[in-house]
From Swiss-Prot:
This is Virulence plasmid protein pGP3-D. InterPro entries: Chlamydia_pGP3, PGP3-D_N, pGP3_C. PGP3-D is required for growth within mammalian cells. The keyword GTP-binding does not apply. It holds the Pfam family Chlam_vir. Changing residue 191 to C: In plasmid pCHL1 and plasmid pCTT1. The keyword Membrane does not apply. Changing residue 189 to N: In plasmid pCTT1. Keywords: Plasmid. Gene3D superfamilies: 2.60.120.1340, 6.10.250.3190, 6.20.30.20.
Amino acid sequence: MGNSGFYLYNTQNCVFADNIKVGQMTEPLKDQQIILGTTSTPVAAKMTASDGISLTVSNNPSTNASITIGLDAEKAYQLILEKLGDQILGGIADTIVDSTVQDILDKITTDPSLGLLKAFNNFPITNKIQCNGLFTPRNIETLLGGTEIGKFTVTPKSSGSMFLVSADIIASRMEGGVVLALVREGDSKPYAISYGYSSGVPNLCSLRTRIINTGLTPTTYSLRVGGLESGVVWVNALSNGNDILGITNTSNVSFLEVIPQTNA
Protein backbone atom coordinates (compact mmCIF):
# COMPACT_ATOMS: atom_id res chain seq x y z
CA MET A 1 0.00 0.00 0.00
CA GLY A 2 3.01 2.30 -0.07
CA ASN A 3 2.79 4.99 2.61
CA SER A 4 -0.05 3.35 4.50
CA GLY A 5 -0.76 2.59 8.13
CA PHE A 6 -2.57 3.61 11.27
CA TYR A 7 -1.84 6.24 13.87
CA LEU A 8 -3.49 7.65 16.95
CA TYR A 9 -4.59 11.26 16.72
CA ASN A 10 -5.80 12.45 20.13
CA THR A 11 -8.37 9.77 20.89
CA GLN A 12 -9.21 8.94 17.29
CA ASN A 13 -7.73 6.05 15.32
CA CYS A 14 -6.89 7.33 11.84
CA VAL A 15 -5.98 5.47 8.70
CA PHE A 16 -3.88 6.85 5.93
CA ALA A 17 -3.26 5.08 2.66
CA ASP A 18 -2.32 5.64 -0.97
CA ASN A 19 -4.90 4.76 -3.67
CA ILE A 20 -7.53 3.58 -1.21
CA LYS A 21 -10.75 2.07 -2.64
CA VAL A 22 -14.10 2.48 -0.92
CA GLY A 23 -16.87 -0.04 -1.60
CA GLN A 24 -17.05 -0.82 -5.30
CA MET A 25 -15.10 2.23 -6.48
CA THR A 26 -12.58 1.12 -9.07
CA GLU A 27 -10.17 4.07 -9.16
CA PRO A 28 -8.83 6.80 -6.87
CA LEU A 29 -10.72 10.05 -6.42
CA LYS A 30 -9.88 12.71 -8.99
CA ASP A 31 -9.50 16.43 -8.48
CA GLN A 32 -12.55 17.98 -6.73
CA GLN A 33 -14.40 14.66 -6.48
CA ILE A 34 -16.12 13.51 -3.31
CA ILE A 35 -17.47 10.17 -2.15
CA LEU A 36 -21.26 10.10 -2.41
CA GLY A 37 -23.34 7.43 -0.78
CA THR A 38 -26.09 5.78 -2.80
CA THR A 39 -28.76 3.16 -2.11
CA SER A 40 -26.17 0.50 -2.94
CA THR A 41 -22.46 1.27 -3.09
CA PRO A 42 -20.61 4.61 -2.80
CA VAL A 43 -19.70 6.46 -5.99
CA ALA A 44 -17.30 9.24 -6.90
CA ALA A 45 -19.16 12.47 -7.66
CA LYS A 46 -18.14 15.98 -8.62
CA MET A 47 -20.11 18.96 -7.33
CA THR A 48 -21.08 21.53 -9.93
CA ALA A 49 -22.83 24.88 -9.69
CA SER A 50 -26.00 25.77 -11.57
CA ASP A 51 -27.10 29.23 -12.77
CA GLY A 52 -27.22 31.67 -9.88
CA ILE A 53 -25.25 29.41 -7.51
CA SER A 54 -21.54 29.77 -6.81
CA LEU A 55 -19.32 26.86 -5.79
CA THR A 56 -15.78 27.29 -4.50
CA VAL A 57 -13.61 24.25 -3.77
CA SER A 58 -10.33 24.65 -1.89
CA ASN A 59 -8.30 21.46 -1.89
CA ASN A 60 -4.71 22.58 -1.72
CA PRO A 61 -2.79 19.75 0.01
CA SER A 62 -1.05 22.24 2.27
CA THR A 63 -4.26 23.80 3.64
CA ASN A 64 -7.53 22.62 5.04
CA ALA A 65 -9.87 21.58 2.23
CA SER A 66 -13.24 23.31 2.02
CA ILE A 67 -16.33 23.54 -0.16
CA THR A 68 -18.14 26.88 -0.13
CA ILE A 69 -21.61 27.16 -1.66
CA GLY A 70 -23.11 30.60 -2.13
CA LEU A 71 -25.36 32.78 -4.27
CA ASP A 72 -23.96 34.30 -7.46
CA ALA A 73 -25.76 37.62 -7.08
CA GLU A 74 -25.11 38.86 -10.62
CA LYS A 75 -26.36 35.71 -12.33
CA ALA A 76 -29.31 35.38 -9.97
CA TYR A 77 -30.20 39.02 -10.62
CA GLN A 78 -30.18 38.47 -14.38
CA LEU A 79 -32.25 35.28 -14.12
CA ILE A 80 -34.86 36.95 -11.93
CA LEU A 81 -35.07 39.94 -14.26
CA GLU A 82 -35.48 37.70 -17.30
CA LYS A 83 -38.27 35.68 -15.67
CA LEU A 84 -40.07 38.76 -14.42
CA GLY A 85 -39.54 40.51 -17.74
CA ASP A 86 -41.09 37.66 -19.69
CA GLN A 87 -44.14 37.61 -17.41
CA ILE A 88 -44.54 41.38 -17.32
CA LEU A 89 -44.10 41.83 -21.07
CA GLY A 90 -46.45 38.93 -21.73
CA GLY A 91 -49.09 40.56 -19.58
CA ILE A 92 -48.54 43.93 -21.22
CA ALA A 93 -48.76 42.38 -24.70
CA ASP A 94 -52.04 40.66 -23.82
CA THR A 95 -53.42 43.93 -22.49
CA ILE A 96 -52.30 45.82 -25.57
CA VAL A 97 -53.86 43.24 -27.87
CA ASP A 98 -57.14 43.26 -25.97
CA SER A 99 -57.45 47.01 -25.56
CA THR A 100 -55.97 48.59 -28.68
CA VAL A 101 -56.62 46.32 -31.65
CA GLN A 102 -60.09 47.74 -32.16
CA ASP A 103 -58.73 51.28 -31.75
CA ILE A 104 -56.13 50.59 -34.44
CA LEU A 105 -58.72 49.10 -36.79
CA ASP A 106 -61.02 52.06 -36.21
CA LYS A 107 -58.14 54.41 -36.94
CA ILE A 108 -57.06 52.87 -40.23
CA THR A 109 -60.63 52.61 -41.51
CA THR A 110 -61.71 56.16 -40.58
CA ASP A 111 -58.61 58.32 -40.96
CA PRO A 112 -58.67 59.76 -44.52
CA SER A 113 -54.90 60.35 -44.39
CA LEU A 114 -54.22 56.61 -44.34
CA GLY A 115 -53.92 54.72 -47.63
CA LEU A 116 -56.07 51.80 -46.53
CA LEU A 117 -59.23 53.89 -46.51
CA LYS A 118 -58.41 55.24 -49.96
CA ALA A 119 -58.10 51.69 -51.28
CA PHE A 120 -61.71 50.90 -50.31
CA ASN A 121 -64.60 51.72 -52.64
CA ASN A 122 -67.68 51.59 -50.39
CA PHE A 123 -71.24 51.72 -51.69
CA PRO A 124 -73.82 51.95 -48.89
CA ILE A 125 -77.43 51.00 -49.63
CA THR A 126 -79.94 52.67 -47.30
CA ASN A 127 -83.23 52.36 -49.19
CA LYS A 128 -85.82 49.73 -48.36
CA ILE A 129 -86.03 47.62 -51.51
CA GLN A 130 -88.68 45.02 -52.37
CA CYS A 131 -87.18 42.20 -54.44
CA ASN A 132 -89.94 40.36 -56.31
CA GLY A 133 -87.60 38.67 -58.78
CA LEU A 134 -86.77 35.03 -58.16
CA PHE A 135 -83.75 32.87 -58.86
CA THR A 136 -84.64 29.54 -60.45
CA PRO A 137 -82.78 26.77 -62.29
CA ARG A 138 -84.02 28.32 -65.55
CA ASN A 139 -82.64 31.83 -65.03
CA ILE A 140 -79.63 31.36 -62.74
CA GLU A 141 -77.29 31.40 -65.77
CA THR A 142 -78.91 34.54 -67.19
CA LEU A 143 -79.32 38.18 -66.13
CA LEU A 144 -83.03 37.76 -65.36
CA GLY A 145 -82.80 36.37 -61.83
CA GLY A 146 -83.70 38.49 -58.81
CA THR A 147 -84.07 42.27 -58.55
CA GLU A 148 -81.29 44.81 -59.00
CA ILE A 149 -80.63 46.72 -55.77
CA GLY A 150 -77.66 48.83 -56.85
CA LYS A 151 -74.97 49.65 -59.42
CA PHE A 152 -71.33 50.34 -58.61
CA THR A 153 -68.62 51.73 -60.89
CA VAL A 154 -65.00 51.20 -59.88
CA THR A 155 -61.73 52.12 -61.57
CA PRO A 156 -58.57 50.07 -60.98
CA LYS A 157 -55.54 52.13 -59.99
CA SER A 158 -53.08 49.42 -61.04
CA SER A 159 -53.15 47.07 -64.01
CA GLY A 160 -52.91 43.45 -62.91
CA SER A 161 -54.45 44.15 -59.52
CA MET A 162 -57.61 42.53 -58.21
CA PHE A 163 -60.72 43.65 -56.40
CA LEU A 164 -61.80 41.82 -53.27
CA VAL A 165 -65.57 42.24 -53.24
CA SER A 166 -67.56 42.12 -50.01
CA ALA A 167 -71.34 42.53 -50.03
CA ASP A 168 -73.25 42.47 -46.73
CA ILE A 169 -76.98 42.76 -47.30
CA ILE A 170 -79.69 42.95 -44.61
CA ALA A 171 -82.44 40.72 -46.02
CA SER A 172 -85.81 39.53 -44.71
CA ARG A 173 -88.45 37.21 -46.12
CA MET A 174 -90.97 34.66 -44.99
CA GLU A 175 -88.87 31.61 -44.15
CA GLY A 176 -86.69 30.55 -47.07
CA GLY A 177 -83.52 31.04 -49.06
CA VAL A 178 -82.05 34.31 -50.32
CA VAL A 179 -79.81 34.55 -53.39
CA LEU A 180 -77.25 37.29 -54.11
CA ALA A 181 -75.74 37.64 -57.60
CA LEU A 182 -72.95 40.02 -58.64
CA VAL A 183 -73.18 40.97 -62.33
CA ARG A 184 -70.39 42.61 -64.34
CA GLU A 185 -71.55 44.93 -67.09
CA GLY A 186 -71.17 43.24 -70.47
CA ASP A 187 -71.38 39.68 -69.12
CA SER A 188 -74.27 37.37 -70.01
CA LYS A 189 -74.53 35.71 -66.59
CA PRO A 190 -73.66 36.52 -62.96
CA TYR A 191 -69.98 36.82 -62.10
CA ALA A 192 -70.52 35.42 -58.59
CA ILE A 193 -73.44 33.94 -56.65
CA SER A 194 -73.99 33.52 -52.93
CA TYR A 195 -76.78 32.18 -50.73
CA GLY A 196 -78.34 33.25 -47.45
CA TYR A 197 -81.40 32.49 -45.38
CA SER A 198 -84.14 34.28 -43.47
CA SER A 199 -86.57 32.68 -41.07
CA GLY A 200 -88.93 35.64 -41.16
CA VAL A 201 -86.58 38.00 -39.34
CA PRO A 202 -83.78 40.19 -40.74
CA ASN A 203 -80.55 38.34 -41.47
CA LEU A 204 -77.19 39.40 -42.87
CA CYS A 205 -76.61 37.70 -46.22
CA SER A 206 -73.08 38.02 -47.60
CA LEU A 207 -71.25 37.57 -50.89
CA ARG A 208 -67.45 37.36 -51.17
CA THR A 209 -65.48 37.12 -54.39
CA ARG A 210 -62.43 38.43 -56.22
CA ILE A 211 -62.19 40.10 -59.61
CA ILE A 212 -58.90 40.20 -61.55
CA ASN A 213 -58.33 43.49 -63.36
CA THR A 214 -56.75 43.44 -66.81
CA GLY A 215 -56.53 47.19 -67.33
CA LEU A 216 -57.40 50.60 -65.92
CA THR A 217 -60.82 50.99 -67.52
CA PRO A 218 -63.76 51.82 -65.22
CA THR A 219 -66.14 48.87 -64.85
CA THR A 220 -69.73 48.84 -63.60
CA TYR A 221 -71.15 46.05 -61.48
CA SER A 222 -74.65 45.46 -60.18
CA LEU A 223 -75.99 43.38 -57.32
CA ARG A 224 -79.21 41.41 -57.72
CA VAL A 225 -81.17 39.91 -54.81
CA GLY A 226 -84.13 37.54 -54.83
CA GLY A 227 -85.84 34.55 -53.29
CA LEU A 228 -84.60 31.02 -53.90
CA GLU A 229 -87.33 29.79 -56.30
CA SER A 230 -90.08 31.48 -54.24
CA GLY A 231 -90.87 34.35 -51.92
CA VAL A 232 -90.47 38.12 -51.76
CA VAL A 233 -87.25 39.43 -50.23
CA TRP A 234 -86.98 42.81 -48.54
CA VAL A 235 -83.63 44.59 -48.24
CA ASN A 236 -83.10 46.82 -45.18
CA ALA A 237 -86.60 46.06 -43.91
CA LEU A 238 -88.71 43.51 -42.09
CA SER A 239 -90.36 40.76 -44.11
CA ASN A 240 -93.54 42.90 -44.30
CA GLY A 241 -91.65 45.93 -45.58
CA ASN A 242 -91.65 47.90 -42.33
CA ASP A 243 -88.59 49.60 -40.87
CA ILE A 244 -86.39 47.45 -38.64
CA LEU A 245 -86.73 48.92 -35.12
CA GLY A 246 -88.16 52.06 -36.70
CA ILE A 247 -84.77 53.26 -37.97
CA THR A 248 -82.90 53.44 -41.25
CA ASN A 249 -80.69 50.40 -41.81
CA THR A 250 -77.72 50.19 -44.16
CA SER A 251 -76.39 47.38 -46.30
CA ASN A 252 -72.97 47.76 -47.89
CA VAL A 253 -70.99 46.67 -50.93
CA SER A 254 -67.23 47.32 -50.95
CA PHE A 255 -64.41 46.81 -53.44
CA LEU A 256 -60.85 46.63 -52.06
CA GLU A 257 -58.09 46.83 -54.65
CA VAL A 258 -55.01 44.72 -53.88
CA ILE A 259 -51.86 43.90 -55.82
CA PRO A 260 -50.83 40.21 -55.61
CA GLN A 261 -47.34 39.66 -54.13
CA THR A 262 -44.73 38.22 -56.48
CA ASN A 263 -41.36 36.59 -55.78
CA ALA A 264 -39.53 38.99 -58.03
